[in-house]
Design a protein with these regions (language model features):
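Conserved AMP-binding/adenylate-forming core of the ANL superfamily
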Residues: 47-51, 68-121, 138-143, 234
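Conserved pre-ATP/AMP-binding loop-to-beta segment of ANL
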Residues: 67-70, 183, 197-218, 225, ...
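Conserved AMP-binding A3 loop
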Residues: 80-82, 205-207, 214-238
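AMP-binding/adenylate-forming catalytic core of the ANL superfamily
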Residues: 137, 143-144, 154-156, 429-461, ...
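Conserved C-terminal "lid"/linker of ANL adenylate-forming enzymes
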Residues: 180, 513-519, 528-530, 543-655
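Conserved AMP-binding/adenylation subdomain of ANL enzymes
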Residues: 237-256, 264-304
C-alpha cells in the first residue's frame, strides 16, 4: 500500500507547483519566450536562405492559402491573396521603373486604402522600404520629414487635400530635394493594373536584413520637427509574435483584423503588415468614425480590432444600443486604454482579450499585456517571475525632477537615484553599447540626447524613455505619465516646439509657451499656448487670423485648443520658458486667479493682474451655442464648470 503516500505526495507536489505557477506566472513567461523563438524560426524557414526580407513571409502565406481567400477588405475594394500578390508585384515593378532602387527608401504620403499595402509590399519586393509620411503634415514639417528620409520618389494619395498640400511645396521637393512626385490617381492605378504581375528577382532583396528598415516612421520630439525611426528587419519577430499572444488564428477561414487607425502610424501600420505576413485578413477602415465603426466591423466580419485609448472612450460615449454585442470582435489590440474606460468597454461590447502594449517608437522598451480578465486589466504589461528576473537591471525606474525633467543625482556620488518598482519613476533601459539603439534616421544629435551616462557607475550607458511607469508585486506594469514637453492629443504626439514655432511666426506674438492641459471627458492633453503679445498689437490682435495661420502650418491635432494671453513674460533664472506653473494651472480659471493673487501679495502689489484665456469650443465638439464654427472666443469660469459637468455626456465635452 506504499503507493498511497506516494500518490498523496505527487498530488501535493502538483498542487504546490500549480500554486507557484499561479503566483509567479512561470508558464506565461516560458510561453512568451518560446513564442518569440518560434516566430524567429518561422522567419528563417520562410526565407529559404534567400535573406531576411518579410516579402518571403508574405509569399509563404500566398502559397499556403487558397487563392480565393480574402486578404484585404475595404469599402473601396476587396482583394484575395492571389490578387494582392499580383498587385504587389505590379507596384514593385512600377516603383523600380520609376527610380526606386534596392537598399534605398521611397516615401508614401497615403491614406488608408488597399493601395497603401500594394505600394508597401511592392517596395519590399524590390529590396526597398517606405518612409511613412503623416498625410496631415504640411509646409516646413512635411519638407523636413521628406528631407530626413533621403527618399527620391514620393507616392501621393489621390485625395484632393493631400495633393494640394504636396502642390504647395512641390517646388521645394523637386528643386531642393530632387524628388520625383507620383500621384496615385485613377489614371496611374489603371496603368499599373494593366502591367504583367511579374515577380521581382531574389537578387533585388539580398540587402534586406539586419539593420535595414522594414519601414521608416516618425515621432514628435521637442526639437520642433518629427524625428524618423527605422523599424529594423531584425526586429521582425517582435511583430509576428503578437498574433499568438492575442490568440488569433491565421487563415484559411482565420481571424480578420479591423484597422481604422492611420496606416502611417505605428500601431495601425504594423498591424496591417502583420496580417500580410501571418495570413490574417486585413480589414481597412478609411479613418476612425464613431458612427461608422461598428457597421464597418459587422460588414467586414472582423474578429479583432485595433485601438488607441481615445478610440475606446469615443465608442463608449455613444448611446447604448441593442447592436452593441452584435458583432464578431473578440480581441482588441492597441495602446493607451485608460483605466476608467477599460472594464466598461470590455463588459459593454463583450471583448474576450485585450492586448495592451507599451513600446517606445524607437523600439528600445517593449511591454505587453494579453489581458483575459480583471487581474491584469488596466496594466500596460505583465511580467512573471522569470521576466522580472531577466529585466531587473535592464528596465530600471529612477527619480526625476518633474520641474526640470532632469534625473536626480546624489550630490556626493553624482549617480542617479534608483526608485523601487512599486513607487516607479522614469524608466531607463540599459544599453550594452551605443549601436544597440538604432537611433533616429539621419539625426545623430537627437540620438545622442536619448542617452544618459554614468547613471549607477562610471562608464555605464542608459536610454531615457521619457515615460514614468511602476510595477506592482504581481508583475503588472502601470503607466504613470509622459515626461518632457511632448504630449498626446487625438492619439498623436504633439511637439511643443513645433507649435511654438508656428505661433511665433504670426505678427505681434513675441513669445509662445506651449504645453498640454487636461480636459474633463477627454483623453490625453489638449494644446494650450501661453502668448505674450507685443503691447503695440494687443488692441488690434486678430485671434481668428491666428487660428487660420496655425491651421495652415500644423496638423489639425496640433492646433492649440486654448490660448492664455499673459500680462507678463514668465521665464526661469536661465531664461528658459517655465511650463510648470502654467501646466499646473491648466484651464481652471480659479487656480489661475488664486496663484496670481498669491504672487501679487508676495510682491507687495495692491491688485493682481489676471491673464485672459481664449478657446476654440469647436475643437472639443463644444461649439453648439458658442460659435458658428472654428474661432477663438473668451474662455470663462462658466465654460470650465460646463466642461466639468459634461465629462460623462456622449461625445465628451458637448455643451
Amino acid at each position: 500500500m506504499a503507493f498511497v503516500p506516494v500518490t498523496g505526495a505527487i498530488a501535493g507536489a502538483t498542487a504546490a507547483a500549480a500554486y507557484v505557477d499561479a503566483k509567479f506566472h512561470i508558464t506565461k513567461d516560458i510561453r512568451g519566450i518560446r513564442g518569440q523563438k518560434a516566430a524567429a524560426r518561422a522567419l528563417e524557414k520562410n526565407s529559404q536562405g534567400k535573406g531576411q526580407s518579410l516579402w518571403y513571409q508574405f509569399e509563404t502565406q500566398v502559397r499556403r492559402l487558397p487563392s480565393t481567400e480574402e486578404c484585404i477588405w475595404s469599402r473601396t475594394g476587396c482583394y484575395t491573396w492571389a490578387e494582392t500578390y499580383a498587385n504587389a508585384c505590379r507596384y514593385g515593378q512600377y516603383l523600380h521603373q520609376n527610380g526606386v532602387v534596392p537598399g534605398q527608401l521611397f516615401a508614401m504620403y497615403m491614406m488608408n486604402r488597399p493601395e497603401f499595402l500594394f505600394t508597401h509590399l511592392g517596395g519590399w519586393s524590390i529590396g526597398s522600404a517606405p518612409a511613412w509620411i503623416n498625410y496631415n503634415l504640411a509646409g516646413d514639417a512635411l519638407v523636413h520629414c521628406l528631407k530626413v528620409s533621403e527618399a527620391k520618389v514620393l507616392i501621393v494619395d489621390e485625395d484632393q487635400e493631400c495633393r494640394q498640400r504636396i502642390e504647395d511645396v512641390r517646388e521645394r521637393l523637386e528643386g531642393e530635394l530632387g524628388m520625383t512626385i507620383l500621384v496615385l490617381d485613377n489614371a496611374l492605378k489603371g496603368e499599373i493594373s494593366r502591367t504583367e504581375p511579374k515577380r521581382p528577382e531574389d537578387e533585388l532583396r539580398v540587402g534586406m536584413k539586419g539593420k535595414f528598415p522594414l519601414f521608416l516612421f516618425y515621432t514628435s520630439g521637442t526639437t520642433g520637427h518629427p524625428k524618423a525611426c527605422p523599424f529594423e528587419t531584425q526586429r521582425a519577430a517582435g511583430l509576428t509574435g503578437r498574433v499568438g499572444a492575442m490568440g488569433l488564428k491565421p487563415g484559411p477561414n482565420g481571424d480578420r483584423w479591423y484597422v481604422c487607425m492611420p496606416l502611417y502610424h505605428g500601431t495601425g501600420g504594423t498591424t496591417a503588415l502583420v496580417c500580410m505576413v501571418t495570413g490574417l485578413t486585413c480589414c481597412i477602415g478609411t479613418k476612425f468614425s464613431t458612427s461608422k465603426f461598428w457597421s464597418d466591423v459587422r460588414d467586414s466580419r472582423s474578429t479583432a480590432m485595433v485601438y488607441v485609448g481615445e478610440t475606446a472612450r469615443y465608442l463608449l460615449n455613444a448611446p447604448p444600443s441593442d447592436l452593441d454585442r452584435k458583432h464578431n470582435i473578440r480581441a482588441m489590440f492597441g495602446n493607451g486604454l485608460r483605466p476608467d474606460v477599460w472594464q466598461r468597454f470590455v463588459d459593454r461590447f463583450g471583448i474576450e482579450v485585450v492586448g495592451e502594449f507599451f513600446n517606445s517608437t524607437e523600439g528600445v522598451m517593449a511591454l505587453f499585456n494579453g489581458s483575459r480578465g480583471p487581474f491584469t486589466a488596466t496594466s500596460v504589461g505583465h511580467q512573471g517571475f522569470i521576466d522580472r528576473w531577466r529585466f531587473h537591471n535592464t528596465y530600471v525606474p529612477v527619480e526625476i525632477d518633474f520641474a526640470t525633467g532632469d534625473l536626480v543625482r546624489d550630490p556626493k556620488t553624482g549617480f542617479c537615484k534608483r526608485k523601487s518598482y512599486k513607487d516607479g519613476g522614469e524608466i531607463l533601459v540599459q544599453m550594452p553599447s551605443e549601436s544597440a539603439f538604432v537611433g533616429y534616421w539621419n539625426n545623430p544629435d537627437a540620438t545622442e540626447k536619448r542617452f544618459e551616462r554614468n547613471v549607477f557607475k562610471k562608464g555605464d550607458l542608459w536610454y531615457r524613455t521619457g515615460d514614468a511607469l511602476r510595477r506592482d508585486a504581481d508583475g503588472r506594469w502601470f503607466f504613470m505619465d509622459r515626461l518632457g514637453d511632448t504630449f498626446r492629443w487625438k492619439s498623436e504626439n504633439v511637439s511643443t516646439a513645433e507649435v511654438s514655432e508656428a505661433l511665433g511666426s504670426f505678427p505681434g506674438i513675441q513669445e509662445a509657451n506651449v504645453y498640454g492641459v487636461e480636459v474633463p471627458g477627454h483623453d490625453g492633453r489638449a494644446g494650450c499656448a501661453a502668448l505674450y503679445i507685443d503691447p503695440a498689437h494687443r488692441d488690434s490682435f486678430d485671434f481668428n487670423a491666428l487660428l487660420a495661420h496655425v491651421k495652415a502650418k500644423l496638423p489639425k491635432y496640433a492646433v492649440p485648443v486654448f490660448l492664455r494671453v499673459q500680462k507678463q513674460q514668465t521665464t526661469m533664472h536661465n531664461n528658459k520658458q517655465n511650463k510648470v506653473p502654467l501646466r499646473n494651472d491648466g484651464i481652471d480659471l480659479r487656480k489661475l486667479m488664486e496663484r496670481a493673487d498669491k504672487e501679487a501679495k508676495e510682491q507687495g502689489k495692491e491688485e493682481a493682474e489676471y491673464d485672459t484665456m481664449y478657446w476654440n469650443p469647436a475643437a472639443l465638439g463644444a461649439g453648439k451655442g458658442k460659435t458658428d464654427g472654428d474661432s477663438y472666443v473668451v474662455y470663462t469660469m462658466a465654460d470650465w464648470d460646463l466642461l466639468k459637468g459634461s465629462k460623462d455626456v456622449e461625445g465628451g465635452a458637448k455643451l
